[in-house]
Amino acid sequence: TLHALANSNQGRIAALASKNLLPVIYPRGDLVASGGLMSYGPDRDEPFRRGARMVDKILKGAKPADMPVEQPTKFELIINLKAAKQIGLTIPPNVLARADGVIR
């Protein structure tokens, strides 16, 4: 799949983007360490916790058809200042202050 292809080549993608002064933005924070500029996406652990709560409700008798569809509610912003410097980008202090994680 395209997702698997991108994941298996994330380092190469980040290196090529950096060489061409292009930012790489990922949907998951764990991918930023490979050289991406930033990530913004749902907290990776939250859906599993939410799923466990839903399973618990079902095991206690709730009907799945009666349960609402849930969407992510917590999103994480991770910024890689090394990558920003490599492509000549300055991240404003107010954006850094809102980040959940900063790679320096």
Describe these PLM feature segments.
Residues T1-R104:
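Short hydrophobic alpha-helices and adjacent helix-cap/hinge residues
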